[in-house]
Amino acid sequence: GQQNPVDALAPPDAALPALAESDPRVAELLAELLGRDKLAVFLQTDGFVRRVVATVDNLGRAHAPSRMWPVQPTAQRFVVDGTGDAPTTNAAANAARYSAFLAFAEAVPMEPAVALYARLYPLFQQAYEELGYPRRYFNDRLVAVLDQLLQAPEPAGPLQVKLTPVNTDVPNLRPWVRY
């Protein structure tokens, strides 16, 4: 059964389109909430509901495919410190890559955002069922992932990273996307 019902947050939108046709309506509602200019810079609205569901479901796992993220990729490259035999670590300069997105996320008005989520919830639930969870409740998964993120420890220093090996004779022109 449902552990974290959405019904009490706001009633679902009575005029929701089918999930397959929902992108324009979802983008319109997100633009009203966040502003059209910020929406274009920070979020991917094509398949937004499915992207959110897939990303949330994968966040508690070892890999969350970036092609399904509901956010736009950062413009700058991922940078590491260390070469040769030295351990490779996440460079401190990487934090600056996310400062604009962090400011955007912190400025999202929480109560209207939660109400919009509840209004659109039937779409999120349908996308979760289509992902392979027909008898599970997406909001329960969302709450579990949020709890997991909140419990994640703050790293004491730079994180060690490892380049994912790709066995090919073709030189990789963008190795920074493989960390």
Describe these PLM feature segments.
Residues 135-179:
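An amphipathic alpha-helical core segment
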Residues 5, 11-12, 17, 24, ...:
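Proline-rich intrinsically disordered, low-complexity coils
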Residues 79-143:
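Mid-length scaffold segments of soluble, non-membrane domains
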Residues 2-97:
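N-terminal Sec/ER secretory leader and immediately downstream segment
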Residues 60-63, 67, 109-112, 128-135, ...:
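Long, hydrophobic, amphipathic alpha-helical segments used as structural scaffolds
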